[in-house]
């Protein structure tokens, strides 16, 4: 009776263990499906984040290269402008000065010759012809008028242009200063723009790293849950195997063995034969 109750109890425990095992298997399958879905959902954002990070890194590199190119071009333009302005100033002004000095020297020589001609008016005609020839040569060289003198020379077109060139030197320098200021402002604006862009990129990268850390923590949590479920399943498998072995051992003990059955059968046949022999002996005596 105790063995029967024990067998019933073990069978009930085995059935409960099987039900729990089926439930655990269903939960494990569901967790596996959720993990697959979760990995699929996480792989797409991860790839998107990787592509975004790569694109933004490429944009930052391109912006840095473009900034370097712009700065180099601006420096080249400024240097070229400065060299052109300085070369023009040093080329134009000395030419004007040399031309003015040469014209002043020629005028002084002409005045000296005229004075000498007036002083030596009583000289020979050869000196007069020489002076006329020199005067004609000067007039052909500098395009003098017939009535030109030292006072009207300063009102000539070349002289006016010379003074205008001198007066236009300061506006050229002012324009150069304005251009340098504009270039400086442009460089400052470009640097501020790149600083703001760099700050935005850093903020975006920080946000992406935070999202990646959150996703990793979620994946680790799901993995721990899955490992716990697997360990519980292994424990239930061990309990199920133990219950099966106990049920099998109790069933073997309750069922009689064939040898004992054969021995009992042989004993009963011997007893029957002895009884028959006794009855056969008793019958002749009675007769």
Curated annotation (Swiss-Prot):
Region entry Disordered, spans: 248-287
Comp. bias (Acidic residues): 271-287
Organism field: Rattus norvegicus (Rat)
Residues that span the membrane, as ranges: none
A matching Pfam family: Filament
Gene responsible for this protein: Iffo2
InterPro entries in the record: IF_rod_dom
Biased composition (Low complexity): 255-267
Record's GO cellular component terms: intermediate filament
Disulfide bonds: none
Homology family: Belongs to the intermediate filament family.
Keywords assigned by UniProt, alphabetized: Coiled coil, Intermediate filament
Entry annotated with the keyword Coiled coil: yes
Name by which UniProt lists this protein: Intermediate filament family orphan 2
